[in-house]
């Protein structure tokens, strides 16, 4: 079979790499891909970004199914486009993807269905938002409602920082439509973890747990990034925590979306804050939902997956995730991000990368933001 993966990052490289391991898979097209996917056996880059043109390609090239990596195509309705043409694709519809594309939608959904999350209010008026900040104090979290390329969340440790964030989004309109509405929520303390599952609309297949680390520098210092590394499994997700997440967050979310008439299919990623209450009992709250695999969490998770990933995706599309199991390498997988100088604020482009093999013993190199130069 031939498969299409949409995206260009390390996440998509890892997804395509794992799909290509299957003896059932002849070729995996990656649109648009990167230098790493261009250099990986059985993968082929596809220079198409228009969603309708991607559907044309899938229809005319006998693509068995399509997997969507990043959030932007999901928010633009790529799943709707493919399904309207009778093409198999794994991911949520534009409507269901609002769990990620609208923070206000997600918070209202969680409140309506009793899913644990931080207390919040939503604002479109800057003065009202400033008044709320003065009332609540700091630390406090300011979130743009829409997708903002990683710039939409400010963890304000002082009231001054919170007021600046409100003005940045609402008054100065620095994030455009994405920041025209903001969510202000209570600051949660504890340890974060990533909990990713596959959903077929009704059944759930959990992936291995993971934890990413966003600070740029060693010792958890420096600015936040898209992620400097991740590992799987996440020790903080004990068997007790695991069951709490499934019972209090994952199952209620899948049921709630169905009850609301917006059936969810695809990868569901719950960003968790794990802590303890006053009596010392563990608690779990939802920081956010994503409607796709995390990056860089995908890389260590895919490295541990022993099952045929293409079979799991097909089960997700066909509504039979209850008929399959995911088997994992019991060893820990660690992913470390190598970033260019100046990352994340002003990454230097054009530096030549050398001495990094695509694959060795127990080591795989996944690419993001790379391309070939004139010398290949």
Can you annotate each of these PLM segments?
Residues 245-268, 290-360, 368-374:
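Active-site "cap" helix and flanking loop/linker of ATP-utilizing ligase/carboxylase catalytic domains
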Residues 44-50, 121-125, 156:
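Short acidic-hydrophobic, aromatic-tinged amphipathic segments that line or gate anion-handling sites
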Residues 38-41, 98-104, 217-218:
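Short, charged, surface-exposed secondary-structure boundary motifs
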Residues 5, 30-31, 67-68, 89-92, ...:
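General beta-strand structural signal in soluble alpha/beta enzymes
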């Amino acid at each position: 079979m031939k498969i299409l993966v949409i995206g260009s990052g390390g996440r998509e490289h890892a997804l395509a790499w794992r799909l290509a391991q299957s003896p059932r898979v002849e070729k995996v097209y990656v649109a648009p891909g990167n230098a790493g996917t261009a250099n990986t056996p059985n993968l082929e880059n596809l220079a198409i970004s228009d969603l309708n043109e991607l559907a044309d390609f899938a229809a005319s090239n006998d693509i068995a199914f399509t997997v969507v990596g990043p959030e932007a195509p999901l928010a633009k309705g790529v799943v709707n486009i493919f399904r309207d043409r009778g093409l198999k694709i794994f991911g949520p519809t534009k409507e269901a993807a609002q769990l990620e594309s609208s923070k206000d939608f997600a918070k209202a959904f969680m409140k309506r269905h009793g899913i644990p999350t931080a207390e919040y209010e939503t604002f479109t008026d800057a003065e009202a938002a400033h008044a709320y900040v003065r009332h609540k104090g700091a630390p406090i979290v300011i979130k743009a409602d829409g997708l903002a390329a990683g710039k939409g969340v400010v963890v304000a440790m002082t009231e001054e920082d919170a007021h600046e964030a409100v003005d940045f989004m609402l008054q100065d309109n620095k994030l455009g439509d994405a920041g025209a509405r903001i969510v202000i929520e209570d600051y949660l303390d504890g340890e974060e973890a990533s909990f990713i599952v596959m959903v077929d609309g009704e059944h759930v297949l959990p992936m291995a747990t993971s934890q990413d680390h966003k600070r740029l520098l060693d010792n958890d210092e420096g600015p936040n990034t898209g992620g400097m590394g991740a590992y799987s499994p996440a020790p903080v997700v004990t068997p007790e925590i695991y069951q709490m997440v499934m019972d209090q967050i994952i199952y209620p979310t899948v049921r709630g979306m169905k009850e609301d008439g917006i059936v969810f299919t695809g990868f569901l990623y719950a960003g968790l804050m794990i802590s303890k209450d006053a009596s010392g009992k563990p608690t779990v709250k939802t920081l956010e939902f994503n409607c796709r695999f995390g990056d860089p969490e995908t890389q260590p998770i895919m490295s541990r997956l022993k099952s045929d990933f293409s079979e799991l995706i097909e089960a997700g599309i066909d509504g039979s995730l209850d008929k399959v199991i995911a088997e994992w390498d019991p060893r820990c997988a660690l992913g470390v991000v190598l970033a260019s100088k100046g990352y994340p604020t002003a990454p230097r482009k054009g530096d030549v990368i050398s001495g990094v093999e695509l694959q060795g013993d127990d080591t795989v190199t996944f690419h993001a933001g790379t391309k070939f130069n004139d010398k290949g």
